[in-house]
């Protein structure tokens, strides 16, 4: 199961600031950008590369690495909380093509939210995904019930990309298992796995509503 939990001291330091209810909007966004960049570098470790030889300014020749897949990246932004996260990913993958998906869960006021809640896609603009060539990165800071992500994955899997990556900051144990049991070939990168969901489908302990905290 390709689950990558990037729980290193720096990522956990940034995560702690994101969880803190006293972190203001500006610093919340900045920290999402920082984690996006770090997680992008972690993804780069799994991409295809070639051994190449170059000549230095001193006339010496030496071997190095050319990550060929850097030219074959598509990043999909799940609005709106993923915007700062994608900004960070683009620092790692400046040549990436970008797509945007707007999705919303169907809620009934005053009622508990089922874990298999309905989700509808209200906006979609995705560049052409080249089958077995492109590496698609789907960004969403929070994977709770995974209902939104599974809806987006229906769109992406049909295109048959080379690899599919999911980038999140916090994933619930329930959501991560649900995604990887249905799509065991997907690479899920997250900073931490949180154990619980409340009756509204939010992750506990979590960090609140990432979109509201980033943009108001």
Curated annotation (Swiss-Prot):
Q: Which GO terms describe its biological process?
A: UMP salvage; uracil salvage
Give binding positions for 5-phospho-alpha-D-ribose 1-diphosphate.
80, 105, 140-148, 209
Q: Which cofactor does it need?
A: Mg(2+)
What Enzyme Commission number(s) apply to this enzyme? 2.4.2.9
Q: Source organism's superkingdom?
A: Archaea
Gene3D superfamilies, A to Z: 3.40.50.2020
Enzyme class comes to transferase
Reactions catalysed, as given in the entry: UMP + diphosphate = 5-phospho-alpha-D-ribose 1-diphosphate + uracil
Q: Which UniProt keywords apply?
A: Allosteric enzyme, Glycosyltransferase, GTP-binding, Magnesium, Nucleotide-binding, Transferase
GO terms, molecular function: GTP binding; magnesium ion binding; uracil phosphoribosyltransferase activity
Give the metabolic or biological pathway.
Pyrimidine metabolism; UMP biosynthesis via salvage pathway; UMP from uracil: step 1/1
Q: Which residues bind GTP?
A: 30-34
Q: Which free-text remark accompanies the cofactor?
A: Binds 1 Mg(2+) ion per subunit. The magnesium is bound as Mg-PRPP.
Q: How is its activity regulated?
A: Allosterically activated by GTP.
Residues at which uracil binds: 203, 208-210
Which protein family is it in?
Belongs to the UPRTase family.
Function per UniProt: Catalyzes the conversion of uracil and 5-phospho-alpha-D-ribose 1-diphosphate (PRPP) to UMP and diphosphate.
For this entry, the protein name equals Uracil phosphoribosyltransferase
Q: Which organism is it from?
A: Saccharolobus islandicus (strain L.S.2.15 / Lassen #1)
| Source taxonomy | Archaea, Thermoproteota, Thermoprotei, Sulfolobales, Sulfolobaceae
């Amino acid at each position: 199961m390709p689950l990558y939990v990037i729980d290193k001291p720096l990522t956990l330091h940034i995560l702690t600031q994101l969880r803190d209810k006293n972190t203001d909007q500006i610093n919340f966004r900045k920290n999402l950008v920082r984690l996006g960049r770090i997680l992008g570098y972690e993804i780069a470790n799994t991409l295809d590369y070639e051994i190449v030889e170059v000549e230095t300014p001193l006339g010496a020749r030496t071997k190095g690495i050319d990550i060929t897949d850097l030219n074959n990246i598509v990043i999909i932004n799940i609005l709106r909380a993923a915007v700062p996260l994608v900004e960070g990913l683009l620092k790692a993958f400046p040549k990436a093509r970008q797509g945007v998906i707007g999705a919303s869960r169907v809620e009934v006021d005053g009622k508990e939210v089922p874990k298999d809640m309905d989700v509808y896609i209200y906006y979609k603009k995705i560049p052409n995904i080249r089958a077995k060539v492109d590496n698609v990165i789907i960004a969403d800071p929070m994977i709770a019930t995974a209902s939104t992500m599974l809806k987006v994955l229906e769109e992406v899997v049909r295109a048959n990309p080379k690899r599919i990556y999911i980038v999140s900051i916090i994933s619930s144990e329930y959501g991560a298992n649900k995604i990887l049991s249905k799509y065991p070939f997907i690479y899920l990168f997250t900073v931490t796995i949180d154990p619980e969901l409340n009756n509204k489908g939010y992750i506990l302990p979590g960090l609140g509503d990432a979109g509201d905290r980033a943009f108001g």
